[in-house]
């Protein structure tokens, strides 16, 4: 954990606790000393803030390349260990960087939908999370984040002081699929299983 991440995590956790009284369930499901993927629904650009504040482990996100486009952004996201990804282009370098981080026993966050959806509506999951999980041979913890759309909807600048909730599901193991990260059928099946578990935590059905 870098000094910058540690400082931002401390300040962010205090801010989130003060403003949002976040309820966290199942934190113990995030394994402590091994590589693990957190796969979450995505309702708001505020999700990473809530998720980081809910978790004691340093988290590494796949962040869109636009966030690295200026000096401050590149310094901030690089210094805190975030992984640059060019959305919509199957960024192989970014996925390999995620695999490398997992093999170093780090925790990597995926938002499989690839963009935000209003409320707790679930979009179709992309297979990048499955490809990485199967190549790195690590468990996936499904995560459900509630109410962040109401806290900071798309296009809004300032968060509302509303309560948030984060639920960490039990880790998913895909032993029978490991080593099949380039198998399209396998990655589609694993992606479906991951999304179904996220949907279950949200109390919804995955319809894709």
Question: Which role fits each region the language model picked out?
Answer:
Residues 3-4, 93-208:
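Non-catalytic C-terminal accessory region of glycerolipid acyltransferases
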Residues 17-25, 89, 148-150:
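Short gly/ser/thr-rich secondary-structure transition/capping motifs
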Residues 22-24, 82, 140, 166:
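Generic structural signal for residues in well-ordered beta-strands
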Residues 28, 42-43, 50, 55, ...:
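Short, flexible active-site-adjacent loop segments at beta-strand->alpha-helix junctions, enriched
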Residues 28-31, 159:
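A short beta-turn/loop motif at secondary-structure boundaries
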């Amino acid at each position: 954990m870098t000094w910058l991440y540690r400082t931002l995590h401390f300040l962010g956790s205090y801010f989130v606790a003060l403003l949002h009284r976040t309820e966290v369930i199942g934190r113990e499901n995030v394994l402590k000393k091994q590589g693990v993927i957190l796969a979450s629904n995505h309702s708001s650009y505020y999700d990473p803030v809530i998720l980081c504040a809910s978790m004691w482990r340093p988290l590494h996100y796949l962040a869109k390349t636009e966030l690295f486009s200026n000096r401050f952004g590149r310094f901030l996201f690089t210094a805190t260990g975030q992984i640059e990804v060019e959305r919509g282009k199957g960024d192989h370098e970014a996925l390999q960087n995620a695999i490398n981080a997992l093999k170093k026993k780090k925790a990597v966050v995926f938002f499989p939908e690839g963009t935000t959806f209003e409320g707790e509506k679930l979009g179709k999951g992309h297979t990048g999370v499955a490809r990485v999980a199967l190549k790195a041979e690590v468990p996936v913890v499904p995560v459900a984040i509630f109410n962040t759309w109401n806290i900071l909807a798309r296009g809004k600048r300032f968060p509302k002081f509303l309560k948030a909730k984060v639920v960490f599901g039990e880790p998913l193991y895909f032993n029978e699929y490991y080593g099949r990260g380039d198998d399209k059928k396998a990655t589609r099946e694993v992606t479906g299983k991951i999304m179904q578990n996220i949907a279950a935590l949200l109390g919804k059905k995955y319809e894709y």
